[in-house]
Swiss-Prot record:
Residues 36-102, 186-251 form the PQ-loop domain. This is Lysosomal amino acid transporter 1 homolog. Its main location: membrane. The di-leucine motif mediates lysosomal localization. The chain crosses the membrane at residues 39-59, 74-94, 97-117, 132-152, 183-203, 221-241, 261-281.
Length: 303
């Protein structure tokens, strides 16, 4: 079956993306041939804006309430970081769109800050009684930093040239054209890693849903974090779907090539909707963040 993995042929000789939008080519290294491609680039940039802003409300909420270690599940944060790390590695290896690589880099950086805050408040509120959680957070922070620096030390792709926009397609069979280029093993590994990252994204929400249910409270968790992530995932997935397939590549092959990243963005929306309903269900009758923090410290002092 490996013999059937082929990439579409290059679009041919000529100038680099002659009919494309120049600003998209310069900014993202993508060839936007028509309004559909330009719209995809715009939605992708908006999604990055949502992701960039999403973590800020949670950072503020953490500093305001001081109970981030109780409000957020460590397994939610670790699962999120694990998915983002694999997403970054998979995007790089599978020759994904530059926008996907840039978004993955920001994901990891924001996760590292979030885990650092979690470890800080865990140590502050529990002293030496939370060594395992803090060690796990530190380990993942180091792993995330090393992975991000390794990826950033390489180019995310070659300089734009006529063949750079040929794209690659898994299971693209029977394409006409002389000498189709085989899909590399590296790209297949990247596709597999991207698939695993999608599973981690889906599973990461479950511990947070359980934590909210167990506490019967969402105090200390910023609703804007999930609202902006939901909007960002929706825009991100739509931008990938909106983009035209490369010449010689069918719509089905294009979707298959980007499927893990689509599941990782659009697939988690249903779970984020559940968390949004929890904010509505627990908004009345729940203790304030200050009361919960005082109770937490009193409980720790009695132990």
């Amino acid at each position: 079956m490996a013999e059937g993995l082929r990439a579409p042929p290059p679009p041919g000789n000529g100038s680099e993306c002659p009919d494309g939008a120049r600003w998209v080519l310069r900014l993202l290294g993508e060839c936007a041939r028509d309004g559909r491609d330009v719209g995809s680039a715009l939605l992708g940039l908006l999604s990055i804006g949502c992701f960039a802003a999403a973590a800020l409300p949670q950072f503020y909420q953490a500093c305001k309430t001081g109970i981030m270690d109780r409000a957020l599940s460590i397994y939610f944060l670790l699962g999120w970081l694990g998915g983002d790390l694999l997403n970054l590695i998979g995007s790089f290896l599978a020759n994904q769109l530059p926008l996907q690589v840039y978004t993955a880099v920001y994901y990891v950086l924001a996760d590292l800050v979030m885990l650092s805050l979690y470890g800080y408040y865990k140590a502050k509120n529990w002293g030496t009684g939370a060594t395992a959680s803090i060690n796990a957070a530190c380990l993942f922070c180091l792993l995330g930093t090393a992975t991000t620096l390794t990826v950033l030390s390489h180019d995310t792709g070659p300089a734009p040239n006529p063949a750079a926009f040929g794209g690659r397609s898994l299971l693209s069979l029977g394409l006409e054209g002389p000498g189709p280029e085989p899909i590399s093993k590296t790209e297949i590994i990247g596709f597999a890693i991207g698939s695993i990252s999608s599973v981690l994204y889906l599973c990461s929400r479950l511990p947070q849903i359980y934590t909210n249910y167990r506490r019967k409270s969402t105090a200390g968790v910023s609703f804007l974090l999930f609202a902006l992530v939901m909007l960002g995932n929706l825009l991100y997935g739509t931008s990938v779907l909106l983009k035209n397939p490369e010449p010689g590549q069918s719509e089905g092959d294009y979707i298959l090539h980007h499927l893990p990243w689509l599941i990782g963005s659009l697939g988690v929306l249903s779970l984020d909707v559940i968390i949004s309903f929890q904010f509505l269900a627990y908004r009345t009758g729940q203790p304030s963040a200050g009361e919960e923090r005082e109770a937490l410290l009193a409980e720790h002092g009695d132990s």
